[in-house]
Regions:
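N-terminal Rossmann-like FAD-binding beta1-loop-alpha1 element of flavoenzymes
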Residues: 1-23
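Short hydrophobic core segments
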Residues: 3, 178-191, 376-379
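Glycine-rich FAD pyrophosphate-binding loop
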Residues: 17-39
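An anion/pyrophosphate-binding glycine-rich loop and adjacent beta-alpha core
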Residues: 28-30, 35-36, 44-50, 211-214, ...
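Feature captures the FAD/FMN-dependent oxidoreductase FAD-binding
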Residues: 67-148, 155-182
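A glycine-rich dinucleotide-binding beta-alpha-beta segment and adjacent secondary-structure elements
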Residues: 116, 436-509
Length: 534
C-alpha cells in the first residue's frame, strides 16, 4: 500500500510486477503537483544529475541516483516528446497533463488501484501478541480477505494468521481502515499547500521513532528587511546575477578548520599569516610562495604593493596594513576571509571565524560556500527568480551576497563619460532605484566622490540578511523531512520490516531543473527493485 499518488508513488506503482497494489491519495485526483511543475510543462529530469545538486546526505543521494539516469526516465515516457532547454532540462512538449497520463496509465497496467479523497490519519503495526489488535484485524475481513487489498493474490486467512506481526493498519480520517504487509510513505512535503500538501508522512515517521528534520520552505523567494525595501519598487524587473552564500558546515576532519589560517615558523610563534579566500573589488590579495612572508597585493587603483601582517595577542588578531612600506589609509576597507574589517580595528579570532563588531561573520572555510548564477526577479514582496530560489535551498538565516554585475568590470565605467545608468549592463530602472536608495544621483562614474564610489561598488557584493521567505504557499519544494540515517539504501526503515519512505518526504531536496522529480523517480526505482525481488 502506497500513501500518496504523486510522482514517487505513481512511478513505484508503475514499476511493481505481480503485486497487489493500492494507492491512497488525499486529493480528489492524483498528481496535482505534477500538473503544476515546470509551469505546467513538467521538467522530468536533467542531463547533469549529480549528488552535488541536492541538499541532504551525499552518500544516500549518490546511492539512490546511481541506478537511474536521465535516459532511463526519458525511455519510461517514450511516447512523449521532450525539449531539452538551457541548463540541460527536459520539458514535455505536450505538457504536464500528458506526463501524468503516462504515470497513471502505467500504474494501472501494473494492476494498481488508486483511491482518491482518502485522508490518512495514522498508521500502526499490528503485533502478533496483541490480541485486541488481532481481533480488530480479523473483524475487518470480508470472507477471508482484508479490505484494502486488491487482486487475486490478496492474503487469505491462513496467511494472515501466519504473518500478523508484519501487517500495518492504516486509518483514514473517516474511520476506514486499510491493511498492508508493505507500507510505502510517498506523501511529499509541505510545499504547494493549496494543492493538498500534508505532514502525515512526518507524523508516521515520528510514530515509529524516526527523526524528522524540521521542514522549511525551499526553492522560494526572500522577503526583505527595511534597508532593502527599495527592492519592492522594482516589481517585475529581472536580470542575470550571481549569489554567494554559506552551506551548513561540514562535519569532517580538517574541513572545520579555517582555510585562511597558516602558521609560520615553529609552533611557539606569536605571528599568524593569512591567505584570502576570494578576490575583492580594488585589490586581489594572495599568499606569497614564501609561507613565512606576509600577504601582498597589487592595488588596482594606486598600483601600490599592499602588505598585510597579523599578530595574535590574548586570542585577538591585530591587523597591520602598509602600502610600499608606508601605513595604509586606516579608513580603507578590505576583506579577509570574506569578513569585512577596518584596517585600524582589532578583530576577535574565534574558531576560524573573523568577527566585525556585532556583525555576523562569514565563515573562512571556502568549501562551505555556494555560488549560484541565474536570473533574479524583484517582486512586491522582495526578491525571487531562479538564482534566488536555488539560493533559498542552502540559506541558513543569515547574510547572502549578490553580485548584480558578475560579467562587468568597473574599469569600463571609469573610462566612460556616459551616465552610470547607461554604462552598467543593468535595467535602467534598477540602477536608478539603487542609486536613489544610496542617496546618489545618476551621473558619469568619474564625477562621483570616493565615498560615493564605495557605495556604487556594492553592486558587485551587495550583502544583506533576508527577513525570511515567501513561505510554503509559494515554495516549490520542502527542505528537511524524514532523516535518511534511519533508512537502508533502498529506502526501507532500519528495524521496521515492511516500512518505506520515498520522494520529497525525505530530508533530500534538489535544485531547480528537474532534480526533485528525478530523485522521486529514482527512490521509487530503487524500492521497486527490492519489492520485485521478494
Amino acid at each position: 500500500l502506497i500513501i500518496g499518488a504523486g510522482a514517487a508513488g505513481l512511478f513505484l506503482a508503475a514499476n511493481l510486477r505481480g503485486k497487489s497494489v493500492a494507492l491512497l491519495e488525499k486529493n480528489g485526483s492524483a498528481g496535482k503537483k505534477i500538473l503544476a511543475s515546470g509551469g505546467g510543462r513538467c521538467n522530468v529530469t536533467n542531463r547533469r544529475i549529480d549528488a552535488s545538486n541536492y541538499l541532504g546526505d551525499a552518500g544516500f543521494v549518490k546511492n539512490i541516483l546511481k541506478n537511474l539516469d536521465f535516459k532511463d526516465i526519458l525511455k519510461f515516457f517514450g511516447e512523449l516528446k521532450f525539449n531539452e532547454q538551457k541548463q540541460s532540462q527536459f520539458f514535455c512538449e505536450s505538457g504536464a497533463k500528458d506526463v501524468l497520463g503516462v504515470l497513471l496509465g502505467r500504474a494501472r497496467q501494473s494492476g494498481a488501484q488508486i483511491f482518491c479523497g482518502v485522508c490518512v490519519k495514522g498508521v500502526r503495526k499490528i503485533l502478533a501478541d496483541e490480541n485486541s489488535k488481532i481481533a480488530d484485524a480479523f473483524s475487518a475481513l470480508n470472507g477471508d480477505k482484508f479490505e484494502g487489498f486488491c487482486g487475486s493474490d490478496a492474503p487469505n486467512l491462513q496467511n494472515v494468521r501466519r504473518n500478523l506481526d508484519e501487517i500495518f493498519e492504516i486509518v483514514a480520517e473517516n474511520g476506514d481502515k486499510f491493511y498492508a504487509k508493505n507500507l510505502v510513505v510517498a506523501s511529499g512535503g509541505l510545499s504547494y499547500k493549496s494543492l493538498g500538501a500534508s505532514d502525515i508522512g512526518y507524523e508516521i515517521a515520528q510514530s515509529f521513532g524516526i527523526k524528522v528534520v524540521p521542514p522549511a520552505p525551499a526553492l522560494v523567494g526572500f522577503t526583505v528587511q527595511k534597508d532593502e525595501f527599495w527592492f519592492k519598487n522594482l516589481s517585475g524587473v529581472c536580470f542575470p546575477a550571481q549569489i554567494l552564500l554559506e552551506r551548513a558546515p561540514q562535519k569532517s576532519g580538517d574541513d572545520s578548520k579555517s582555510c585562511s589560517q597558516s602558521k609560520s615558523g615553529d609552533a611557539d610563534t606569536k605571528e599568524d599569516k593569512f591567505s584570502v579566500c576570494r578576490e575583492t573589488i580594488g585589490a586581489n590579495l594572495k599568499q606569497s610562495s614564501d609561507k613565512s612572508a606576509p600577504l601582498q597585493t597589487n592595488d588596482l587603483n594606486s598600483k601600490k604593493v599592499v602588505t598585510l601582517a597579523a599578530s595574535r595577542q590574548n586570542g585577538e588578531i591585530e591587523l597591520n596594513l602598509t602600502a610600499n612600506e608606508a601605513p595604509l589609509d586606516k579608513n580603507r576597507e578590505f576583506y579577509e576571509s570574506d569578513a569585512k574589517f577596518n584596517a585600524s580595528q582589532e578583530i576577535e579570532f574565534n574558531g576560524g571565524e573573523i568577527l566585525n563588531g556585532d556583525a555576523k561573520a562569514w565563515k573562512s572555510n571556502q568549501k562551505n560556500r555556494t555560488k549560484i548564477a541565474g536570473d533574479v526577479l524583484f517582486t512586491h514582496k522582495g526578491i525571487s527568480g531562479p538564482a534566488v530560489l536555488n539560493a533559498s535551498l542552502f540559506w541558513q538565516k543569515g547574510l547572502i551576497e549578490i553580485n548584480f554585475c558578475p560579467n562587468f568590470s568597473i574599469e569600463t565605467a571609469q573610462k566612460s563619460k556616459k551616465q552610470l545608468s547607461t554604462v552598467l549592463p543593468l535595467p535602467r530602472r534598477f540602477t536608478l532605484e539603487f542609486l536613489s536608495a544610496a542617496g546618489l544621483s545618476d551621473k558619469p562614474y568619474g564625477k562621483y566622490a570616493q565615498a560615493e564610489r564605495e557605495k556604487i561598488l556594492r553592486l558587485f557584493s551587495y550583502r544583506f540578511a533576508p527577513a525570511g521567505t515567501f513561505g510554503f504557499e509559494r515554495a516549490e519544494a520542502t527542505k528537511g523531512g524524514v532523516d535518511t540515517d534511519a533508512l537502508e539504501a533502498d529506502c526501507g526503515v532500519k528495524g521496521v520490516r515492511g516500512l518505506y519512505f520515498i520522494g520529497e518526504v525525505l530530508n533530500v531536496t534538489g535544485m531547480l531543473g528537474g532534480y526533485n522529480l528525478h530523485f522521486a523517480f529514482a527512490c521509487a526505482w530503487a524500492l521497486a527493485g527490492r519489492l520485485n525481488a521478494k
